Amino acid sequence: MPHQLFTSESVSEGHPDKIADQISDAVLDAILIQDPKARVACETYVKTGMVIVGGEITTSAWVDIEEITRCTLAEIGYVHSDMGFDAHSCAVLSAIGKQSPDINQGVDRIDPLDQGAGDQGMMFGYATNETDVLMPAPITYSHRLVKRQSEMRKIGQLPWLRPDAKSQITFKYDKGYAVAIDTIVFSTQHEEDVTQKQLEEAVMEEIIKPVIPTQWLSSSTKYFINPTGRFVIGGPMGDCGLTGRKIIVDTYGGMARHGGGAFSGKDPSKVDRSAAYAARYVAKNIVAAGLADRCEIQISYAIGVANPTSIMLETFGTEKITIQKIMSLIHQHFDLRPYGLIKMLDLLKPIYRATAAYGHFGRDVFPWEATDKAELLREQAGLNQ
């Protein structure tokens, strides 16, 4: 097979869609602190000078949505009208309703283990051994670039940076393995008086070089840094932002399939979120155990029904034991019923705001990134002999 090129992108916490995701998840976290059993589906819209927070929330908690919104915007860095958005002066509108009782009766049960899925749908999880975090290289390094931009901005190393930024990396693959970087694209919002030459040099020296391993780079690697030559108007002034519009950035950068459901603003009774996390947990432990080099899992559910309607496993010919044996180990060691996976991954804690920028996967601070079952899986697969 000839060389193939594969591209993934990421966006910073100051991107309009990511602002919306972070506000939705900040509201969710604030509610879970008081009421872990709350039902939350929180959507956010941001545009110049305005934030609208809406959705369906059923809870005994009271949270100050306006204060949460302003604090989130300030933490991201939108604190002055010069940036086109100011946390302190923007309008914040709330339009919150309650979850339908028709859904409640399908989800809530006397025995928690019988808790039904909050909706139908299919979710995917994926892992690959091509990076240290068992994630695809293109999305991993795309995330790290925009995360580095945020760090340089917040510590004042590059004080002319502004919150909105995007990255995109094209990797060259040979026989399914990443071998080199073909192209790096990086665009960052900046103050008006910064020259293109000054910006290009700073981005290369302070953002790209510290993040990208030299073994991926060569004299033929192409760089496009702020290729339009100007990125002063950005954030919500440049584009409106909506919760749930960056689902490929949130997951595997297009390297794996996606069921279509967004994550942010949803409590873990919504399998769009919790089952996608569980699928990643299963796939990562399979790869960490050495049962396969690459692994993709699909799980599907019916609303109000506890047990998955299907589980699919794809290892792309990299499996070290039979697919049937791996499937047997999944059924034996992973409870993929809605309550089972919530308990397995301890998902009722207020951990979601941190997921809403720089990827839900590939960062070890999250419980679904643990590889605590890998040794057991390896032993029962007979690979320790």
UniProtKB/Swiss-Prot annotation:
PROSITE patterns with a match to the protein in the record: ADOMET_SYNTHASE_1, ADOMET_SYNTHASE_2
Record field: catalytic activity: L-methionine + ATP + H2O = S-adenosyl-L-methionine + phosphate + diphosphate
Binding positions for K(+) per the UniProt entry: 43
Predominant localisation class: cytoplasm
Molecular function terms from GO: ATP binding; magnesium ion binding; methionine adenosyltransferase activity
GO biological process, one term: one-carbon metabolic process
Binding site for L-methionine: 56, 99, 239, 270
InterPro entries given in the database record: ADOMET_SYNTHASE_CS (IPR022631), S-AdoMet_synt_C (IPR022630), S-AdoMet_synt_central (IPR022629), S-AdoMet_synt_N (IPR022628), S-AdoMet_synthetase (IPR002133), S-AdoMet_synthetase_sfam (IPR022636)
Subcellular locations according to the entry: Cytoplasm
CDD domains: S-AdoMet_synt (cd18079)
Keywords: ATP-binding, Cytoplasm, Magnesium, Metal-binding, Nucleotide-binding, One-carbon metabolism, Potassium, Transferase
Named cofactor requirement(s): Mg(2+); K(+)
Pathway: Amino-acid biosynthesis; S-adenosyl-L-methionine biosynthesis; S-adenosyl-L-methionine from L-methionine: step 1/1
Positions with a binding annotation for ATP: 15, 164-166, 230-231, 239, 245-246, 262, 266
Binding site for Mg(2+): 17
Oligomeric form and interacting partners: Homotetramer; dimer of dimers.
Name of this chain's protein: S-adenosylmethionine synthase
